[in-house]
């Protein structure tokens, strides 16, 4: 069920700050009939960028970035047309510390969606805090 329909979700200011955005991002959260697990969807209007990347270029940038990160917690799914996938399901990664990112794109419309599937309780604030501490102290994952 969707909520935050006023488009004033409490996390918008931090999304804007950390992503260094000049405008508020569009965020429309929803909840379902499950105890944990989450899909975050980030819509991108690529045509608003100075240089418009293709979906493949966007995918390659994310895949290259996460391939070099120790620990391998984040996986970027193979790029291609996906109409439906059993893996794009909120509970798919429950009980893990993993995240899977999907890049869905329509190059003709210069639009893309980034989808991230993860266990919001296992990958929640406490897990993120430990990973941030490790980064700050120069420790491994």
Describe the function of each predicted region.
Residues 98-141:
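NAD(P)-dependent Rossmann-like dehydrogenase/reductase catalytic/cofactor-binding core
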Residues 1-114:
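C-terminal substrate-binding/catalytic lobe of Rossmann-fold NAD(P)-dependent oxidoreductases
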């Amino acid at each position: 069920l969707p909520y935050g329909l006023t488009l004033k979700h409490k996390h918008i200011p931090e999304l804007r700050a950390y992503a260094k955005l000049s405008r508020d991002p569009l965020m429309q959260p929803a909840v379902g009939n499950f105890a944990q697990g989450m899909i975050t969807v980030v819509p991108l209007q690529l045509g608003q960028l100075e240089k418009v990347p293709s979906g493949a270029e966007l995918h390659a940038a994310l895949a290259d970035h996460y391939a070099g990160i120790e620990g391998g917690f984040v996986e970027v799914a193979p790029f291609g047309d996906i109409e439906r996938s059993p893996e794009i399901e909120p509970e798919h990664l429950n009980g893990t510390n993993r995240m899977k990112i999907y890049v869905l794109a329509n190059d003709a419309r210069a639009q893309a969606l980034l989808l991230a599937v993860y266990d919001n309780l296992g990958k929640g604030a406490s897990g993120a805090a430990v990973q941030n501490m490790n980064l700050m102290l120069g420790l491994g994952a």
